[in-house]
Amino acid sequence: MMRSHYCGQLNESLDGQEVTLCGWVHRRRDHGGVIFLDIRDREGMAQVVFDPDRAETFAAADRVRSEYVVQITGKVRKRPDGAVNANMASGAIEILGYQLNVLNEAETPPFPLNEYSDVGEETRLRYRFIDLRRPEMADKLRLRSRITSSIRRFLDENGFLDVETPILTRATPEGARDYLVPSRTHAGSFFALPQSPQLFKQLLMVAGFDRYYQIAKCFRDEDLRADRQPEFTQIDIETSFLDESEIMGLTESMIRKLFKEVLDLEFGEFPHMTFEEAMRRYGSDKPDLRNPLELVDVADQLKDVDFKVFAGPANDPKCRVTALRLPGGASMPRSKIDEYTKFVGIYGAKGLAYIKVNERAKGVEGLQSPIVKNIPEANLNNILDRVGAVDGDIVFFGADKFKVVSEALGALRIRLGHDFELLTCEWAPMWVVDFPMFEENEDGSFTALHHPFTAPKCTPEELEANPATALSRAYDMVLNGTELGGGSIRIHRKEMQQAVFRLLGIEAEEQEEKFGFLLDALKFGAPPHGGLAFGLDRLVMLMTGAQSIREVIAFPKTQSAACVMTQAPGLVDAKALRELHIRLREQTKVE
């Protein structure tokens, strides 16, 4: 063994013992003829002292520079009074070094590891192997390892089997674009990288493996956001012979145990909320319950007003008119209101009406807004009473299609909560249930809200008769406004699966071509089954307080789905393309 201890393992109990450390020189200091080296490894840092009494070792220490890889042997001793470093786990001790071996020298890093705040993300990703040396980055990956270990331990203890499913499979419509892999041996045919192990885990249920899990790599060729990557990791779980309440209870126990083990946080029982209630009160199917602001529908008070902006949507069943009260917001300057108006425009809102409540006792005279002249005073009072407005508040309004208003004011609610520091707690887990089975498109066609394999809460005949109002047996776990995991009871009867396919516009021939293997499996005694998948990257992001999942993945892609370190994706030579039966067409230049 080249080392006896990690730096982070050193403490006062080792006083007087000889230790050997291996790591990187984090910092070098020369104080009054004594050289101090801070040595860093994956577990932490330790201070090593070299004095001139050992001339050869002192000279070696004098030559080392930051990021040199070294092996150091010395004796642990307590630091002198007043020299204890409370910010370092080993800050109560230091090592008196008497042997130093330089294992490798290092050029000056492209950015200092002690002063990283102003370094651009692209530079950090280009030199990710340097960036990961920073203690806060190493801490995140260590925590990620602890998280996966805790989850595996829980699932193993509860009788789940870790089963791997294929990476090379065939394309199936799951909502996003597939990454395609050309086949050399089957000219003109392509594999697809899996967006999830969905169908294979269902087939494992048919095969009798009634408790399955996998820490699975998944791939989606879609536009990136702060919480998206083209390849991501999923905690994939499937069970047979459990209903949704049992699956939710089991996975909730897993998350509660995880937070207790890793962060020493105790969660109570997670509240449940229907999709309809979440959209009505919060404008989102993943509400952040730390935020006390709520949307309040006021269409009934505006149906007969002489103001088409409100009256039109108030009389349209596909629209909503909603109010959002911000306590103490009446002092908000017009420039800030304009900023929020521009913000809701991102979500399709055509404007942002408002009423400043200066002094309610004065009636309309105590309200400041360009819209109050269009609304009878009695209706205004009813609206202000309903939202709980008091002097000093501002009330925002949205009036448009249901989806536009929900998304716009739902996003504004989140923005206001952060801007005005309204969050009431650090963690707010919950379940959202009773999702619609389908989303209706403008042309009257339907899209599966979750995926085509989710079971509805009705018979096939009822589903085909009333698809727009059918509810699914789906459930999402939400934490702080982020979807942590989503799942459902699956369809386990062939007739129901075919009915869902038909409603999605997938006719018999296409069903057989794309899903024949699944339909075959459902004929041979498929058990009732369901499951759930958690996004591991999102989970780690939340538990570490990172701002992006790129911060908790060792080697992530950029926002443009590229790796600036390896220069992937890259070109391949003509021979490889010929073997794959592929010919590239030159793009026509636009003049």
From Swiss-Prot:
Homodimer. It is found in: Cytoplasm. PROSITE patterns: AA_TRNA_LIGASE_II. It catalyses: tRNA(Asx) + L-aspartate + ATP = L-aspartyl-tRNA(Asx) + AMP + diphosphate. Gene3D superfamilies: Bira Bifunctional Protein, Domain 2 (3.30.930.10), GAD-like domain (3.30.1360.30), Nucleic acid-binding proteins (2.40.50.140). The record marks H31, G82 as: Important for tRNA non-discrimination. Keywords: Aminoacyl-tRNA synthetase, ATP-binding, Cytoplasm, Ligase, Nucleotide-binding, Protein biosynthesis. L-aspartate binds at E174, R220, H450, R490. ATP binds at R220, D221, E222, Q229, E483, G535, L536, D537, R538. Aspartyl-tRNA synthetase with relaxed tRNA specificity since it is able to aspartylate not only its cognate tRNA(Asp) but also tRNA(Asn). Reaction proceeds in two steps: L-aspartate is first activated by ATP to form Asp-AMP and then transferred to the acceptor end of tRNA(Asp/Asn). GO terms for molecular function: aspartate-tRNA ligase activity; aspartate-tRNA(Asn) ligase activity; ATP binding; nucleic acid binding. Belongs to the class-II aminoacyl-tRNA synthetase family. Type 1 subfamily. This is Aspartate--tRNA(Asp/Asn) ligase. Pfam families: GAD, tRNA-synt_2, tRNA_anti-codon.
